[in-house]
Structures are given as structure tokens and as C-alpha cells.
Amino acid sequence: MPGMYRNSMRHHDSTFSLRSRFVALAVGAAAVLAVVSVPAAAEPASSGGLRWEACPAEYELDPASDQCASVAVPRNYAEPDGGTIDVLVTRHRAEDPGSRTGVLFTNPGGPGGDAIGSNRMFVDVLPAAVRAQWDVIGVQPRGLPYAGALSCVMGPEHAMAAGFGFGGAAARAACESDAPGAAAHLTTENTARDWEQVRVALGEESIDIYGLSYGTVLGSTYATLFPDSTGRMVLDSAVDPTWLWNEVLWQQNEGYKGRFNDLMGWIAANNATYGLGETALKVYQRWSDRIVAEAGGNPTIAPPPAQVGDVPPGLEALADAYRSGVDLAGPVRVQFEAFIRGLADPSHTQMSSSIYLMTRQVLPARNSWPLMARVIRDGVEAIPGGGIGGMTEQELERVAQTQMMQSVVMCNENSVAARPDRIPGWLFSTFVTEDLFELLGYSYSAGAFCAGAAPVASLPALSNRGLATAPLVLQGLRDPQTPYLGGAQLAHDMGAHLVTVDGGDHGAGIQGGNAVIDQAVAEYLQTGRTAITHAPEAPIIAPL
């Protein structure tokens, strides 16, 4: 998409394979947020001191309803006279101007989520009453395109460091190679202070907030710094601030494994539709076969527990012993098979499989599970766009640039000490199995990812002091991306009203089709309270 990355990342041809591995890690780690790409043709309007006009064309936003403007903010708030950056802001006008209540700031998570395109996603899924009464506002996080985008020059040494697992140090060095110190201002607190500058530019006395995932940390940071300017705040899929950042990825490991078993079980329960097997273990084998066919290497995540339907005919009397033996041998078997395949050909690795990378991506969003089942049944050709192998060079650079910015922020403000006892697990998962369900957590927790990129800032202690209205937290019980206990902790820290949501969807309020959640969000934003404390899992509304 021309123009989106004006300061694009450059690379040396000899480092392409290692850079591609970095991109594969980024793709595999990405949360599915279903951001809507949406054309922009102008008709400028001005209000609140800002000049509203068509958004950049790549966002494909209709200027009749969605416009953009830029706000100049200090590059360094500790040195306000030290220069500024222009931060792009998008606005979707309240659909019933006569009942307009105020502004609702949104953030899709990350760090590194694009707030311009995602703002339209929020508009599309928010309850109609909210769309009618609020201007929905997206503020592009600093460091991304149209907000002081970093120029990250990935040389051979940076690509090598990233390929070997030291992504944080590689990102910081690559993004500071042209301008030493340029990455130090990329912090959650500075982005929250950018929100305050935008509030003032809009001429609003206060803002309401809808923060998703990392956006719950950003929103809570704003509320802590500017309680008098904070109205009502929805924190969807929240994060324990004491986990930032090494512990967040570690906590995700077990959640993703559990949610993987949920996916296998769901496909088995829908065997009449997909024909992939009536047990989770049989579905797993079909999934594994597809990955081997695509990449030559088999997955190493442990197979799901065996069920009665997995016991061969004639062994029913020994079913319990058989199942116990299969469960005991399964993890060792798949790792041994992957090791042997790798010896035969080192290029045969699960990380080369688009199906494997896609699997981890879809786990937090059940509406993507029907597509995943079709991909397992029909092969990689069923992946829209052809998967990572079908990505253009520009798309690969876009993913890598987003991952660069995320890495910089996370290492800039990491507050969790490294666990040297987890170094063996990091080495094994990174250099032997290349198992995404293990290596991301081990890489951060062991201290490898941010090694050589020491923190330069810290978050303020998050609190509800001075807030007129208690926040609302929506938290999924089996959400692998932001585990439930972390959300409950942030709810405690912020004195929030907690709504527990069944299932494991990440972003309870953005999945669509959950009338109870829609009611809770609308009631809360309109009145400042809701009596709802529990919501069912959202139905799958995607076609099977």
C-alpha cells in the first residue's frame, strides 16, 4: 500500500532468510484483531481547532463519516521545547448528532496496533447506542506511520541478532542506527500524554475510553495521569501491569496450549461438517500431516489427550491404559519426529508453515475457527492471500515494522527480571524445536529477547485515584492472549467492575453477536454502571 511506510525498513539481501524468520515470529505472535481496511476522498471540515480532512488513502475510509487531522505533540515531554511530532487522529462522527454525548478514544492493543484503521473496526462492532452518541476517536501511537514513524534500518548484524532470538536489542539498534536515542521516547506514558494533547486540541473537557488488550494498559495509564479528564473507561481483555513485559508472554504459553486443544475439540465436534475426525487427537494428526506436507517439519506442541474413540478395536478392555500410554508418549514422539526430520533437512521446520503460524493466530478468535478447519481440510490454498508465502515484500516490511515498534516499547519499559533458570527452555524451543507455543514465552522470560536493550522508562503505578466513575473490565475465562487472572488483577488495581465472559475469545466486546456484552457496554457508557457480572461465550457467527 503505497505511502503507508514512508520511512520503510531496509535490509541487506544476505540477511533475508533471518529477517523472514523474524517476520514469521511476528506473524505467529500477532493477535487477531480483524482490523478493517477501509478510501478517502476529501471535503475538509474544521472544528475544535483541528483541520479535518480525508484520511490517508490506504485506510479506505469514507470521508463522509470518518476524517483525519494531525496534532503536534512534544517528542520528549521532559523537554517540551525539544521539537514535536505530528500524530494522526481519526474521528467517526456520532451518528445521531442531536444526542451526541462526547468522545470515545479507542486503542486496538499491541503495542504497535494501528489506531487509524482499527478505529473503524470499533465503530463496526460497538453497540448502535454508542455509535449514535459518541464521536469515536483513534489516535495513532507514536512510532507508527503518521505519528513520527521510526526509520528502522535492518543491517546484516541486526537481522542476525533478531534471527537468533535477540529481537529487542536488534529492533532498538536498527531503529536508532540513523538517529541514536530516537527510540527512547516510545513509551506507554508518552502515548498517554499524546492522548491528553489530542483531548485539548479537540476542546473536550474529558474523554471516554475503550481500550483493548494493551489498550487497557494505555487507557489505565491515561486515567492514572489525568483522572480529572477521564470519564468512563471500558477495559476489554486486560493485563496485569506487574507482568509487563517479560511475564506477559510467559503467561500466554499455557493459555495458548489449552486453547489449541479447544480448537481441536471444536473441529472434532463438527466432524459432520469438516470430516477431519471425531476426536481431537484425530484432528491433530490431520493438522500435523498438513504442516508436514507444506513445510517438511511436523509441529511439536503436545497432542490433545486421547479419548475412547482413539482406542483401536480389540483394545477396549485396556482403554484406560492405552489412553494413558498415548498421552505419556505423545509429547516425546512429536519432538523426536521433528528432530529426525530436521537432521534429514534443516529447512524442514514447522516455522516454515503458514498453516502452523495461522493456527496460533486464530486461537483467541473463535470466529476464525471455521476457516482454520477448512484450511486443515483443504490445504494452504484455502488461506486467504496464500499465507506468509503469498505476502508481498511491502507486506512483509509492514509486519516487520510493526514488530519493531512493539519490541522497542516492550523493552523500553520492561519491569520484570529475567529468569536465568529458563534459559535451557529458551535454547531448546528456539534452536531445536522452533515451537511458537514455547519459544515466545521462554524468549522473554529467560531475558533473551530484551538482552542488550535495558529499560529506559517505567509505567506509573496504575490507580483509580481521582476517577469519578469506576472502569468496566471485560475478561474471558480462557483468553490465551490476556489470561483471566491478569485481567482480574487490573480490575482490582483500578477499582473496576468486572464482567467475567465464558470462553476464550480475546476482545469480548469486539467479536460480535454477544448481546449480553453489548448491553453491558452500552449501559456502562450511558450511565456509568451495569449490573451485569457474567456473560456467555459469544456465538460463532462466521459461516461454517
PLM region descriptions:
Residues 204-214:
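Alpha/beta-hydrolase fold nucleophile elbow
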Residues 192-206:
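Conserved acidic catalytic loop of the alpha/beta-hydrolase fold
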